[in-house]
From Swiss-Prot:
Residues 252-256 are annotated as: ACP-binding. It catalyses: malonyl-[ACP] + acetyl-CoA + H(+) = 3-oxobutanoyl-[ACP] + CO2 + CoA. The active site is at residues 114, 251, 281. This is Beta-ketoacyl-[acyl-carrier-protein] synthase III. Belongs to the thiolase-like superfamily. FabH family. Its EC number is 2.3.1.180. The last Arg residue of the ACP-binding site is essential for the weak association between ACP/AcpP and FabH. It is found in: Cytoplasm. It comes from Rhodobacter capsulatus (Rhodopseudomonas capsulata). Homodimer. Catalyzes the condensation reaction of fatty acid synthesis by the addition to an acyl acceptor of two carbons from malonyl-ACP. Catalyzes the first condensation reaction which initiates fatty acid synthesis and may therefore play a role in governing the total rate of fatty acid production. Possesses both acetoacetyl-ACP synthase and acetyl transacylase activities. Its substrate specificity determines the biosynthesis of branched-chain and/or straight-chain of fatty acids.
Amino acid sequence: MTIRAVVRGVGHYLPARVVENAEFEGKLDTTDEWIRSRTGIERRHFAAEGETTSQLAIKAAAAALADAGLSAADIDAIVVATSTPDFTFPSVATMVQAGLGNTNAFAFDVQAVCAGFVFALANANGMILSGQAKRVLVIGAETFSRIMDWADRGTCVLFGDGAGAVILEAAEGAGTAADRGILASDLHSDGRYRELLYVDGGVSTNGQSGHLRMQGNAVFKHAVQKLAETAHAALAKAGLTPEDVSWIVPHQANLRIITATAERMGVPMERVVVTVADHGNTSAASIPLALSTARARGQIKAGDLIVTEAIGGGLAWGSVVLRW
């Protein structure tokens, strides 16, 4: 008998405020056409004044619990991937725990920026395989609007706010690639590249955060190469190839990176989940948001083989292969 961490439920939450590209015209030297042609982004959601990362995460978690037909008390562990926590501490995960009314789980945050959800999934998988937890609530949640430099057209038009959640549950498998659940993961970091993507100040409880800084062209080159490599590596660990993939669910950084990575992997865009036009780059929230959205659209179905891949500041990058 082999234990697998299978997806029991998914959910997401997006703030009510929708910001179209046109809102940036007049404020910045940019246009809707410029943003669309370079990023594929048409709109994004921004949190309201006072709306926090933990609040978005709680709503996404509640949706995932409802989808799974579970109560908060059924969860043994909560892992939140975020780089925009409400406070330096306590963790967003413990705030989610309190918000859901759970008192029996252990809860902690994972910080790998845009790669955070992939790292969190891999951690949750390990906890289930080791027997530490039977059900793990894994959340990606961000309020990147708090750390934007609104004078920098190269970054502030890219990002959005939101949250997505996945509930993993221990289940018996046959130990083959036909099993449901997480089949393999592949994680990497290289701190030599910290200057390519970072925030020039820390989280603070008075709301005065630093601003995101990015060398976009350099990040693009690293992203396409490293994302394709890590996806291939995870598939190889599972004894699978790109031809076996039903869906790539990538980090929704921008359409150019998504398209170039799929091309490098030899996977047609018809088998790639794309939500970046409506959400922008929501960092650690983008993959669970895309999973939940794709399931709601009827794209992802039971038995589908899915590859998630992401890269973020650090640099940190990785992928997870799972069967729905």
